[in-house]
Amino acid sequence: MGVLTFRDVAVEFSPEEWECLDSAQQRLYRDVMLENYGNLVSLGLAIFKPDLMTCLEQRKEPWKVKRQEAVAKHPAGSFHFTAEILPDHDIKDSFQKVILRKYGSCDLNNLHLKKDYQSVGNCKGQKSSYNGLHQCLSATHSKTCQCNKCGRGFQLCSIFTEHKDIFSREKCHKCEECGKDCRLFSDFTRHKKIHTVERCYKCEECGKAFKKFSNLTEHKRVHTGEKPYKCEGCGKTFTCSSTLVKHKRNHTGDRPYKCEECGKAFKCFSDLTNHKRIHTGEKPYKCEECNKAYRWFSDLAKHKIIHTGDKPYTCNECGKAFKWFSALSKHKRIHTGEKPYICEECGKAFTRSSTLFNHKRIHMEERPYKCEECSKTFKCFSDLTNHKRIHTGEKPYKCEECGKASSWFSHLIRHKRIHTREKLHKC
């Protein structure tokens, strides 16, 4: 009988050794360990999940778990395979094909770290050994994970795992406290904190509670209006230091968060998280009314207004209500007279960017919209739409008084004056 422990496919790091690896190598380490464990599971050899796996799934540093507990907490964590489970001639073949199929000629010893490193300086050899593993993997690591549902390929198995959850009908992670189901383990971990974290610092103004006193202090500035963090570049002030750090990247152009799939970089980690959904196809925000799903919460919030008919944004001047704040902002320019969009050719100003765009065609003499019936061209798409009614005979504007229909809205307005005159002269 052969015995295979998780240590046989595990790499162990001290804090000093971990610091010697760059971010790409750290990501590679996570992917290798998670993939190896997943392959053990697929062979039916993994009985218990080591703490190291839980640590890696939560993107924590691997050395923060006690070394012995991380890879050998349970005696049953040793994986036994006998002739009844796997015949002797299958053990080598199955293990090499499944566990090592992506690592080419890499020996298992390449996945083990020497234990005689006593200082940061000594771990340079460790890093070069890991670089060897990186080189061996890089040749076969491009788009190695392919989805059998939609055929998409992924460079990183962590992204592939998230993508696979989209097709899973069952929401596999269930909260024992409230019964909520989560598809992604990361979402499940985040949700559990609602129940486990004790929030002992409470705001006296609004009753909101926080787990840290520093968070409460930052929150209080919402009520006081205090903005102690000032940008030296432009003088803008902020309530939180983290917001100032993000703002400074506008001046420096720094984009520290890079997408591993397409290489696009972002200023904020939240922007990178949102962007990744383009690659994974994940749409976590679902409408309860029509089941339509969205990648971003802001899109779901806009969509919900269709069902509710709610118009939460009201103009203080005339009382007109709007579904979206952007529409209210544009409307307010009617009252203020603000015209922020100026033509560089003639200096004429406009309230909307779309109006300026249409105006610029006067100078360029561009008429991009052509009628397929008579070949007449127009500067604006709306003019082409109005013109087409000559050919179709469509009359969408109907008078409520007499039922007469008109092709254009301006004709309906002119027609309505007939009825208003009749009412004025009627005794």
UniProtKB/Swiss-Prot annotation:
SMART domains: KRAB, ZnF_C2H2
UniProt-listed GO biological process terms: regulation of DNA-templated transcription
Function: May be involved in transcriptional regulation.
Entry's family note: Belongs to the krueppel C2H2-type zinc-finger protein family.
Main location: nucleus
InterPro entries cross-referenced by the UniProt entry: KRAB (IPR001909), KRAB_dom_sf (IPR036051), Znf_C2H2_sf (IPR036236), Znf_C2H2_type (IPR013087)
Domain KRAB: 4-75
This protein's UniProt keywords: DNA-binding, Metal-binding, Nucleus, Repeat, Transcription, Transcription regulation, Zinc, Zinc-finger
Pfam family, one: zf-C2H2_6
UniProt-annotated location(s): Nucleus
GO cellular component terms, semicolon-separated: nucleus
Zn finger (C2H2-type) location: 145-167, 173-195, 201-223, 229-251, 257-279, 285-307, 313-335, 341-363, 369-391, 397-419
Protein's name according to its UniProt entry: Zinc finger protein 736
A molecular function GO annotation: DNA-binding transcription factor activity, RNA polymerase II-specific
Keyword Zinc-finger recorded: yes
